[in-house]
UniProtKB/Swiss-Prot annotation, chain A:
The modification Cysteine methyl ester is found at residue 213. Mg(2+) binds at residues 22, 40, 63. GO terms for molecular function: G protein activity; GTP binding; GTPase activity. Serotonylation of Gln-67 by TGM2 during activation and aggregation of platelets leads to constitutive activation of GTPase activity. GDP binds at residues 18-23, 121-122, 124, 152-153. It is found in: Cell membrane; Early endosome membrane. This is Ras-related protein Rab-4B. Pfam families: Ras (PF00071). It comes from Homo sapiens (Human).
Amino acid sequence: MAETYDFLFKFLVIGSAGTGKSCLLHQFIENKFKQDSNHTIGVEFGSRVVNVGGKTVKLQIWDTAGQERFRSVTRSYYRGAAGALLVYDITSRETYNSLAAWLTDARTLASPNIVVILCGNKKDLDPEREVTFLEASRFAQENELMFLETSALTGENVEEAFLKCARTILNKIDSGELDPERMGSGIQYGDASLRQLRQPRSAQAVAPQPCGC
Amino acid sequence: MRRAERSPAPPACGLRVDPYGFERPEDFDYAAYDEFLSAYLAVLTRRALKWSRLLQGDSGLRRTATVKRYIRKGVPLEHRARVWLAVSGAQAQMEQNPGYYQRLLRGERNPELEEAIRTDLSRTFPDNVRFRKMAQPCLQKALSDVLLAYGLHNPGVGYCQGMNFIAGYLILITKSEEESFWLLDALIGRILPDYYGPAMLGLKTDQEVLAELVRVKLPAVAALLDGHGVLWTLVVSRWFICLFVDILPVEISVLQTVLRIWDCLFNEGSKIIFRVALTLIKQHEAFILEATGVPDICDKFRQITRGSFVVECHTFMQKIFSHPGSLSMTTITRLRESCRAALLAQR
């Protein structure tokens, strides 16, 4: 079945082992928590079409193995990503401490303009928390990241994290800050927008898109 | 907590959990499996008789042409651990180092290693009832000990994700921690190139070697991947890292296929991995070539590790020695050298 969408964004999910990257992706795509899951070896892949600010956007999401040594294998997949979820586990300081290294990888290997949202996952395990909200939000501010605490278990803020990242990219396209036509932007026009581009302007108003905010 | 809906009771003809503790998937095709099994049982019976005779003989398990032929046709389950230990050299190592495994576990601890292993314990074979926390006995403890001992024994490698599946699988087959440890040592220390070390250079090299072999033997597939800028890492790194465990779906029917692959791996070495990979790709060449984009290519490479072709292990194992054509160790060694040099130059 052919899907129509205005844009396609390449996304990454990165962060240390055991932070719940694959569970976040699974929750976002399947709308449920993956109870019995294997860890990711190498790179996995998922996609979903979302509606953001009246535009349909296909998110092509690359989920990566978190163990340090796999970075040398997965890095090749960073190239041309438009957005990233940078994930740590709020109950593990160690996963928080390695954020800077992951961020450097994303900005040098994907694109300096990559839109990154920091996700403090396992929000449902608040009693075991080792990283405060305040501390992480300061880190996010200093590094110009968006920030949410998420729970792949309950689904809290999972959808929001992906949508927020997508919305920011769309805004940057609108403002001209991001150019989808630039090589390696991680953004492609979909069939829908190509059709619109080919059609005379008057035809564009026929089917207004519902607002998905 | 929400869980995936379960289907109603399985048909009376089959058990929901196989003899190794793996839960069968909801869409398990009992009829097709029974049909395959009734034919395969005859093969197994014949092989079992021949193996009993071989093992009773004086020549035993020296690596002769007869033993190689026998192993390619499948080692009966009851002899599997013994044969793997003998042909891989693990048995000799174990006998030369009595008590070594236990001493490793009593020795100095390494908290970082322990933490890395702990992260993956509940993520190893989650679909196997014996690896669940509530199982009695729970194999997570054995798994943890084998991985820990190995990381202490070979600190250059430590623990790499993927080793958990291999160790877990060895524990299921040998039912012995110590034997699993020495077999893991045979695989990581001798049989496989450096797949699991921090630089994973052996893994990256072998992925490139496979790419080169596909370029020569199946140029259309290579052109498809190259054309879409798909790196072979994406589609095959799991095949190499997990040695087809957890790739070819692990219920008993396909488990047989993985066991049969490992029979040859322990006896003939890492070349077997290329034979299996090339056979899977060649068999499904037309199907792979239908792919129109990167996600589609990934999906097709996932699908080719499923279905009747891989379930029918006896035919599958015959095909890995005929389908890919000639594949000499000289070729592999030469390709490994050139790919490794190219990778080192890129750094």
